[in-house]
Design a protein with these regions (language model features):
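C-terminal nucleotide
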Residues: 1-86, 97-132
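Conserved glycine-rich beta-strand-loop-beta hairpin in the small C-terminal domain of fold type I
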Residues: 94
Length: 132
């Protein structure tokens, strides 16, 4: 429940780009590769590798300043028991998601709850929307 403004986060990214053109370009290219890799990994159902790509993405976001102290703490907790963890949304609030397997699910939920974070589990639907 962290108050934030998506607009302020977008401004933060634009400011980073303005001050660090080469680094922003490098990170953008790396991110494009992460996206391509994840699309392949999803088709192959390779959860651990997807988790590693999530962690890479999170590093890139942190490099451009899309995080805060609370998110950083949540990320550290999630990394202990998951394949990967990253912020979701614009990055200024307090929302992340972690990718784990069934055997670690209850442990990771407990860890977050012990730290007084709201959390819930969701399953990935690989089938997607199915019509007749």
């Amino acid at each position: 429940n962290i108050e934030h403004s998506t607009q302020s986060m977008v401004s933060k990214v634009k400011e980073f780009e303005k001050r660090n053109k080469e680094e922003f370009s490098r990170l953008s290219n790396l991110e494009s590769q992460v996206i391509e890799d994840v699309l392949k990994l999803i088709k192959e159902n390779k959860m651990q590798e997807i988790g590693r790509k999530m962690n890479q993405n999170q590093e890139y976001l942190e490099n451009i300043g899309i995080s805060n102290k609370e998110l950083t703490n949540m990320i550290k907790i999630g990394q202990e028991l998951s394949f990967g963890v990253k912020i979701t949304g614009s990055g200024g609030g307090g929302c992340i998601f972690a990718l784990t397997n069934e055997s670690n699910l209850q442990n990771i939920l407990k860890k977050f709850k012990d730290e007084n974070y709201e959390c819930f589990s969701a399953k990935i639907d690989f089938k997607g929307l199915n019509t007749f």
